[in-house]
A protein has these predicted regions:
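N-terminal secretory signal peptides that target proteins for export/translocation
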Residues: 1-8
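Generic structural signal for short, flexible, solvent-exposed coil/loop and linker residues
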Residues: 8-9, 127
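Bacterial N-terminal signal peptides
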Residues: 10-22
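C-type cytochrome heme-c attachment and multiheme electron-transfer modules
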Residues: 22-47, 51-222
Length: 222
């Protein structure tokens, strides 16, 4: 019994450490978006994307920037978005939120290009380029209402649930964007910074019970 009494506190301590480690994984600190460890970021986590003063209000086309107090140089690239059912390539604009993500992830702007300065550090991991035809459609290629609404969940339900939000194009139309699936500040602590763990099972926002692909099925009725 003495050895058992010795073991139980030890097991509890291990469990507590594991729980704390799991909690610590959520949030931007220590995530792939934590650039504070690099000298070019001046050891500040937020600065490459946000700043308190003299920030970017509009892009080169006069479109109001979606990100609050945005500090990173925006891309001016044009994107190939998707191949439609007829095999035609959709080339167009992305939503204003995705423009912020692509200012690093399309590879046309250096990661350390912020605060009005020209950077030299090019993104290597997570590089999408400007040809997005092999990625989930976003922006003008993924506008709601969908041509097949019976296969899609009403976006009002998703937004009300606080997950999978639609984003706005410059003309005000709602569309799927990068941040419909990804939470860039890693608040959920999930793989690939997703709003919902896609390996999970459970109840979707419209009440369907699904087994696996929970993130996908919060939008797609399958």
């Amino acid at each position: 019994m003495k050895s058992m009494r010795t073991f139980l506190p030890s097991a509890s301590a291990v469990l507590a450490v594991c729980m704390l480690a799991s909690i610590a994984q959520a949030g931007i600190s220590g995530s792939k978006h934590d650039f504070g460890q690099f000298g070019w970021a001046k050891n500040q986590i937020c600065l490459p994307c946000h700043a308190p003063h003299n920030t970017i209000v509009k892009d080169a086309n006069g479109v109001v920037v979606a990100g609050p107090l945005w500090n990173h140089t925006l891309s001016t690239a044009t994107y190939d978005l998707y191949y439609d059912a007829a095999g035609q390539k959709v080339t167009g604009k992305v939503d204003t939120n995705s423009m912020l993500c692509l200012s690093c992830h399309d590879g046309t702007v250096a990661v350390d290009s912020f605060g009005g300065g020209a950077g030299t550090q090019q993104l290597t991991a997570g590089l999408l380029g400007t040809d997005l035809t092999n990625d989930h459609p976003i922006g003008e290629a993924a506008v709601w209402p969908n041509p097949n609404p019976s296969f899609m969940v009403d976006p009002a339900l998703r937004t009300a649930a606080g997950i999978m939000p639609l984003r706005n194009l410059a003309d005000g139309r709602a569309a799927v964007g990068c941040t419909s699936c990804h939470e860039p500040h890693n608040r959920k602590g999930t793989l690939h910074m997703l709003w919902v763990n896609n390996a999970g099972s459970g109840t979707t926002v419209d009440g369907r019970t699904v087994s696996g692909s929970l993130l996908c099925q919060n939008c797609h009725k399958k």
